[in-house]
């Protein structure tokens, strides 16, 4: 039995620091590296890529809407031609930096509002899929587990990686509880570790109403930019390893 742990990295911008990339690279098996549209600068991104190379961590393009001011968390109605070009641009930029760092980009994980939108918006989903196919159809696409995007991407011939979130609550229907709702974000590292162990071993999680819901995931996202993020990620990894579950990248 095995699972991947991923985290969003390379998001520091100039004097503004975000997360502890060095620590997280010692925990995760895949790094979703910012591409400069929602966060990250070239020098910082390159440093993160070099760290990933040294640690044997897989690299993915964390593509986003063009939204530095909103950290990529604002919904945008982007024209198809623009969205396709923006995604191609971001992947290409990261591929260049990855080559310089001695590694390569093996997957794409959209960020923030783009991630949430394409999970259910067919038009923008098609645009992102088209962009990936245009630049490198071998790249895997990380998607929200159980979302329509799983089927859309698979039907388009992409390799699909279903993702669960370690620190997020789930509805009885297996979807994420909105961040606007109380209890949507979990902060107890021990609880989070136990939940992820259940997810990997049984394919289920305890929903916010106390029921059990099914979630099939190939990768678990452990956020690196929240308070206590490193300790939580370590707790998740430790719990899995103690139960003999191997941690390895999906790509």
From Swiss-Prot:
HAMAP family recorded: PxpA (MF_00691)
Organism of derivation: Paracidovorax citrulli (strain AAC00-1)
Gene: pxpA
Similarity section: Belongs to the LamB/PxpA family.
GO biological process: carbohydrate metabolic process
Tagged with keyword ATP-binding: yes
Catalytic activity: 5-oxo-L-proline + ATP + 2 H2O = L-glutamate + ADP + phosphate + H(+)
Protein name: 5-oxoprolinase subunit A
Record text on subunit structure and interactions: Forms a complex composed of PxpA, PxpB and PxpC.
